[in-house]
Amino acid sequence: MPSSIDTIFITHDHKDHISALNVFLKKYNPKVYMTSKLKRALDNKINIKNFVPLESDFTLEDLKVNVIKTSHDASDSVGFVFESGKSSLVYITDTGYINVKYFELLKNRSIYIFESNHDVEMLMNGKYRYDLKVRILSDRGHLSNDMSSDYLVSLIGKNTKYVVLAHLSEENNTVEKAYQTLVNKLEINHIEDKKILVASQSEVMNMIEI
């Protein structure tokens, strides 16, 4: 139930990530965690009454939250590593690359929710304007299927149970391409099968328990 949601984490201010926030906050009053820079960018758009600054790692009850700076053409953008006991989850989407300084923190986590935005060939042969294609491929754009899979091959470990490929472009990707790219790279690198799921933009996934 929406009323049971007491905490929201905002990664960045692009419309596809915050379009429902204003409506939700008119009816409910959860704590909203975001960076101060991002809050300032949204002040004229959304009335956030219960704002909590998100500037560094912290603990929320029994949940440790690590903040990862991502590289995206937004007012500010972040990803997260959530830890509770022996379980952990990485959430990274909307980034052109991942800074190497975070690699050790990101390794061998239980679940990865990871951007696999586009197939480069589909993007370059598609109908997007050239400047938009350049933006998507830039260091402040999005991870392609190949980039995402390369990162995941170097990060996942024996404790990893699930990989969820997320933020797929409906114009420049397919579920099959994203999935098969990762499967192929896991096989090449002799990494045992993990449970690989692909998130849909229009359908809610089942709950994952670890």
Predicted regions and their residues:
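Short, polar loop motifs at secondary-structure junctions
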Residues: 35-41, 54-57, 201
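Active-site environment of divalent metal-dependent phosphoester hydrolases
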Residues: 14-18, 40-42, 74-75, 98-100, ...
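Active-site metal-binding motif and surrounding structural segment of the metallo-beta-lactamase
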Residues: 1-34, 38, 110
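Core dinuclear metal-dependent hydrolase active-site scaffold
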Residues: 1, 19, 53-111, 208-210
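Generic structural signal for residues in well-ordered beta-strands
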Residues: 49-51, 65, 196
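Cap/insert and terminal regions of metallo-dependent hydrolase folds
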Residues: 100-199
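Metal-dependent catalytic neighborhoods of phosphoester/phosphodiester hydrolases
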Residues: 19-28, 43-45, 173-180
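Short, basic/aromatic-enriched C-terminal tail that caps enzymatic domains
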Residues: 194-210
